[in-house]
């Protein structure tokens, strides 16, 4: 068995950076989906049922992706990175399109796709740390992941506030549709998700 080499601070930084995008997208979803459902006409008693996507997709997708990513090898991207990329592409597209949903069923379907896509990226990204780092550096790797998770969550929470209070966007649209600040927030989240995952893919071996 080959001995794993110790990595530098910046190499570990690069490995964990993708979680910034993952948590940015996840945080936008968690903070805004109920409002999106309400804008589309969902009643308060329907919203808990519409939120079933997150736990259900986690239960289904995580073990499947974990199994597959353990056994997948791409000649260019390697073991886990194909899943980083596939999940990031689908999650980013879904984030951008989500605020343009025209009906509750459409937003609910988008949420299922988004949660599945996030899980496709997230589970292999977690496992990547254990694949690459020696045991003595694992705690440092997981700490770095937690750091980027925290940063992503903060950015997701601040983005709508920034657009409303600093940029001066309107909180309510004139036609009663999903407001522009939500659309811009999800656009930034989608771009950030893909950019962060691409950074990790291309800066790590």
Where would I find each of the regions flagged by the language model?
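Central cavity-lining transmembrane alpha-helices of secondary-active solute carriers
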Residues: 47-73, 93, 151-157
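C-terminal membrane-cytosol helix-exit motif in multi-pass small-molecule transporters
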Residues: 160, 164, 168, 190-205
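Glycine-rich segments within core transmembrane alpha-helices of 12-TM secondary carriers
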Residues: 57-59, 139-169
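Helix-loop boundary and gating motifs at the non-cytosolic
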Residues: 2-57
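Cytoplasmic membrane-interface "Motif A"-like loop-to-helix N-cap segments
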Residues: 71-87
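Cytoplasmic helix-loop-helix junction between adjacent transmembrane helices
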Residues: 112-148
